[in-house]
Design a protein with these regions (language model features):
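Conserved AAA+/SF3 P-loop NTPase catalytic/coupling segment centered on the Walker-B
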Residues: 1-12, 33-34
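Conserved catalytic/switch belt of AAA+ P-loop NTPases
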Residues: 9-23
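Charged, glycine-rich active-site and insertion segments that engage polyanionic ligands
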Residues: 20-21, 29-136, 140-143, 147-211
Length: 214
């Protein structure tokens, strides 16, 4: 959120006279970054992260017939996001995206370029799957960098905590950040409607280059 006063004053005018059929949602770590005039014109709702125990309880209530082991698996994939946990249990695209991200992590841990390419090509022709899978893989890279720097397991955000720990043993925090940036670039290419097959081939090569330079 841009907190420059002039920008917030412009935002205030939009809030006071919003375009027709428009809902405005503002997010921030604290409402205090907004001008008092904005705060007085909006509904402020506090949000807190959901613990794994809370996720388990919610999912067990929603899916009483599902085995606890499967619910625990969904919680590990969703990492405190109950919506993601539900999508995982119902085998929506998120389930396949998690599989893709974890597969990339395993392929990197194994140091095999062919496995990287094979994992990525599962999403060939599936733009939204590839994009979401790469976004989840970025979360794994984030965890890998954090673990390398001594981060705590409880603060892990990815769908592959143990995989990120394994990756952190061979990937420095700087290398994880560089690879994160590479993946960001390729997500941008996907958004720009670049050819998916060519994008996958190029990305696999870039990941392999990062592996041989570890």
């Amino acid at each position: 959120m841009n907190t420059v006063i002039q920008v917030q004053n412009i935002l205030l005018k939009v809030i006071e006279e919003p375009p027709e059929h428009t809902a405005i949602i503002l997010t921030a770590r604290s409402k205090e970054i907004f001008l008092p005039t904005i705060i007085s014109r909006v509904l402020s709702l506090g949000m807190t992260s959901v613990t794994e125990a809370e996720s388990m309880a919610c999912l067990q209530e929603k899916y009483p017939a599902v085995a606890p082991a499967l619910i625990s698996e969904a919680v590990s994939a969703g990492r405190g996001n109950i919506g993601r946990c539900v999508e995982y249990l119902e085998h929506s695209q998120f389930f396949d995206s998690v599989k893709l991200a974890r597969g990339l992590c395993d392929a990197m841990c194994g140091g095999n370029e062919y496995d990287v390419l094979k994992t990525l090509f599962v999403a060939d022709g599936k733009k939204t799957l590839l994009r979401e899978g790469l976004s989840l893989f970025q979360e794994i890279l984030r965890d890998s960098a954090a673990f390398r720097l001594g981060g705590e397991s409880e603060k892990s955000v990815s769908c592959a905590k143990e995989g990120a720990k394994t990756l952190s043993r061979s990937l420095s925090s700087d290398q994880a950040v560089r690879l994160y940036d590479i993946v960001s670039d390729y997500i941008g290419r996907i958004d720009a409607n670049c050819n998916i097959s060519l994008t996958i081939n190029s990305l696999a090569g870039q990941i392999y280059l990062s592996l041989i330079h570890i």
